[in-house]
Amino acid sequence: MNINATLFAQIIVFFGLVWFTMKFVWPPIAKALDERAAKIAEGLAAAERGKSDFEQAEKKVAELLAEGRNQVSEMVANAEKRAAKIVEEAKEQASSEAARIAAQAKADVEQELFRARESLRDQVAVLAVKGAESILRSEVDASKHAKLLDTLKQEL
């Protein structure tokens, strides 16, 4: 065969092969490449969404942690205030109780002192009566002297 005819036949076969490839082989390959590109794009978009969701979740967690810390610090401050208030109330109550006990003790002491004075007055009156009786045995008027001693007792 002639080189020109062979070259011409090869060109026809080449263009036939190009046409066949473009008509039947290339569309499924292009479709597969497009699908693969779409999947990759979807994956990248999902990764980007995941990243932004993760960042938002991190921000929310940080906000919740800060809020939790604030609440805990408020609770601690309130507990400290309550404890200080309870201690102060206990001090005031103890102080008032001590004052009440001291006043009661003072009243008891005064009452006991009054009783002791009355007892001493009675004893002094009895001793005075006995002394006067022994001195004035001859002239004893018990009722008259008792009245005098009662007035004396009242004056003491």
UniProtKB/Swiss-Prot annotation:
One of its GO terms (cellular component) is plasma membrane. It is a single-pass membrane protein. Its main location: membrane. Keywords: ATP synthesis, Cell inner membrane, Cell membrane, CF(0), Hydrogen ion transport, Ion transport, Membrane, Transmembrane, Transmembrane helix, Transport. It holds the Pfam family ATP-synt_B. It comes from the Bacteria. One of its GO terms (molecular function) is proton-transporting ATPase activity, rotational mechanism. Coiled coil: none annotated. Signal peptide: none annotated. Belongs to the ATPase B chain family. This is ATP synthase subunit b. The lineage of its organism: Bacteria, Pseudomonadati, Pseudomonadota, Betaproteobacteria, Neisseriales. The gene is atpF.
